[in-house]
Swiss-Prot record:
Signal peptide positions on this chain: none
Descriptive protein name: Putative membrane protein ORF7
Taxonomy, superkingdom: Viruses
Region annotation Disordered: where it falls in the sequence: 66-118
GO CC, one annotated term: membrane
Keyword Transmembrane: yes
Gene name of the record: ORF7
Bias-annotated ranges (Polar residues): 68-103
Naturally occurring in which organism (per UniProt): Ictalurid herpesvirus 1 (strain Auburn)
Length: 140
């Protein structure tokens, strides 16, 4: 490919004429863009590259903000391993309450609307119910 480019550039430079620096680049550019088909090819490549770049940006943005997504485990209301406080705020289940629903949070979350201000976090609530029922001790 480089040999073809240099041959086409050499056609525009007169024999015995020595050009150094920028003029030789101008001759190479003129050689590459003189052919209408090559110019159309370069324009198509540029448009395709731009479209691919925009598609990648869109996919990355969509993966960071999925529709109807819920934030899990990133706020102050999650229970860490080893903690024993239960029922101390609105996001935890108290000792006397019972869990209504399936034990698979993924299937349950698909049918529920996104979290609002008055909703509990279902995954956290189920984990606490399982911990209480199985009496799992996380302390070392």
């Amino acid at each position: 490919m480089a040999a073809v480019i240099l041959e086409r550039a050499a056609e525009f430079v007169a024999p015995g004429e020595a050009r150094v620096g920028y003029p030789i680049l101008a001759e190479v550019y003129r050689a590459l863009t003189s052919d209408h088909e090559m110019r159309a090819f370069y324009e198509t490549c540029a448009v395709s590259f731009f479209a691919l770049f925009m598609l990648i940006i869109w996919v990355l943005h969509a993966s960071r903000h999925p529709e109807g997504s819920t934030t899990r485990g990133t706020d102050a209301h999650t229970q860490t391993e080893g903690s024993t406080t239960r029922g101390t705020d609105a996001h935890t289940q108290t000792e006397g309450s019972r869990d209504q629903g399936s034990m698979t949070p993924e299937a349950d979350d698909l049918t529920r609307p996104p979290l609002g201000h008055g909703r509990q976090i279902p995954v956290l609530r189920r984990r606490m119910v399982l911990d209480r029922d199985l009496r799992i001790d996380y302390s070392l």
